[in-house]
Structure formats: structure tokens, C-alpha cells
A protein has these predicted regions:
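Intrinsically disordered, low-complexity terminal regions
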Residues: 1-251
Length: 251
């Protein structure tokens, strides 16, 4: 009896350890398209701007457990064109029922996106469990995450970046444009050209507010905020966090 139970346990463990993956690799014309949006659930999004006139999408789906292959088969990378926008979406299978009850052994796939998007495209990137990285965009960009950091490099803006558990780091190419940054558990770092003209509003509860230029910080312990302008205040910058510091850097 003990041997039988041991064999069954080993088989169960072996089944749970099964892993599989599948690659989605396609390109789409950007004729008549000025916006691209991505909605993911579990997995990171990496987006790179380039000078080619088409969108390149590479998504790696991975799944674990005895139903790994079935999970991959039922997980869809949906691509639709609506007006001037191409929309990408990870569509997970509906949770199965077992004897009338939800099957809690079911696991959704993990999908990592790597995108190459024309430089002047407006981008909106969203994921729940994963980080967002974007580089080189010459137009507005919006990023949302729940459990994951956001890192934007060499961007023109305007920028909107929101997460719950994760830090946000933004490096502008040139002067800062209107931007809003929010997180709960994480720090905020924003770097921009010294020629920027900014009206800033910065708030944190458990953290510091710092800059390599003079900031009018109110509050020494507990909640802190800083409001003011830099070089006239033509563009707005609002940063909020609860547990983390806010740092501004003029390059």
C-alpha cells in the first residue's frame, strides 16, 4: 500500500512539473494605424520603437502542470484592428468546472511580449503580473501594471505610468512633457533635459523627495509633498507613491 501511494505521489509530482511553451511570431502593416495597445495578464511586456513601417509581435506562451499543452492551446493572442488602432490581447480560457465546482487546479498561461513598433506610434501597454519596459518612443505612452515595475527609456512623452507593487523609472529624451506617475509600493525616478520647463506636484507618505535642483519639500516625518516650478512651469509633472521615494534629475 505504501509503495502504491509513493508511486502515485511521484507520478503526481512529475505531472505537476511538466512545462511547455509556444511562440507567436507575426508582423502587421501599420498603414492607417497611429495607435497600438496591449492587454496582458501574466507576463512582461517589452516594447521597442524602430524606424520600420510595420508592427512586429513576438509572444512566448508558457504553461506548467499536467494540462500545460491544453492551456497553451486555449490561450489566445488576439490581434484586432479598430479604426486607427491595433489591439493585442491575451485571452485566457475560462476556468473549467469539475463536478459542478470551479477547478482550482487550473493555471493560466504566462505570456511574455516583445514588440517592435514604429517610433511615432501612440502606445498603451497593460499587464497585471509582470513588468513593462519601453524604449525609444517619440509619442505619448501609457503603461499600467499591478504587480510589476515600469521602466521607460529614451521617450518623448507625454507619459502616464501607473502600478501598485513596483517602482517606476522614466528617462526622457529631451525636455519633459506632461506626465503623471503613480505607484503604491515603490519608488519613482524621473530624469529629463535641463531645458525642461516643469510645474511639479510630488507626494509620498513613507519615503523622501529629492532632486538635483532645489525642491520646496514640506514635511519632515510621515507624509511629504513638494509643489513648485522649474524653468517656468510649462509642462506638468505629478508623481505619487505611498511606500517609496521620489527623485527628479535634470540631465
Amino acid at each position: 500500500m505504501r509503495k502504491t501511494l509513493l508511486v502515485l505521489a511521484l507520478l503526481s509530482f512529475a505531472g505537476a512539473a511538466v512545462a511547455d511553451d509556444e511562440v507567436f511570431d507575426k508582423a502587421y502593416s501599420m498603414e492607417g494605424v497611429s495607435r497600438v495597445s496591449v492587454e496582458n495578464v501574466n507576463g512582461k511586456i517589452e516594447a521597442y520603437a524602430w524606424d520600420r513601417p510595420y508592427l512586429k509581435v513576438r509572444a512566448i506562451k508558457s504553461a506548467h502542470g499536467v494540462r500545460a499543452q491544453e492551456t497553451l492551446r486555449l490561450t489566445e493572442i488576439r490581434v484586432r484592428k479598430a479604426g486607427d488602432e491595433i489591439r493585442l490581447e491575451t485571452v485566457n480560457p475560462r476556468r473549467r468546472r469539475l463536478f459542478g465546482f470551479l477547478d482550482f487546479g487550473w493555471q493560466n498561461a504566462h505570456v511574455d511580449y516583445e514588440l517592435h513598433i514604429p517610433t511615432l506610434t501612440q502606445a498603451r501597454l497593460e499587464t497585471c503580473n509582470g513588468k513593462v519596459i519601453a524604449t525609444g518612443f517619440g509619442n505619448s505612452i501609457a503603461c499600467d501594471a499591478v504587480n510589476g515595475s515600469i521602466e521607460l527609456k529614451d521617450v518623448f512623452g507625454p507619459v502616464r505610468a501607473t502600478t501598485v507593487n513596483g517602482s517606476v523609472r522614466i528617462v526622457f529624451r529631451g525636455p519633459l512633457k506632461d506626465s503623471r506617475v503613480e505607484t503604491v509600493n515603490g519608488s519613482v525616478d524621473v530624469a529629463f533635459d535641463r531645458a525642461s520647463s516643469i510645474r511639479y506636484n510630488l507626494e509620498t507618505v513613507n519615503g523622501r523627495i529629492e532632486g538635483d535642483f532645489q525642491l520646496a519639500v514640506e514635511g519632515k516625518f510621515g507624509p511629504k509633498e513638494a509643489r513648485g516650478s522649474y524653468n517656468g512651469g510649462a509642462e506638468s509633472l505629478r508623481c505619487e507613491t505611498v511606500n517609496g521615494s521620489i527623485r527628479l534629475k535634470a540631465n
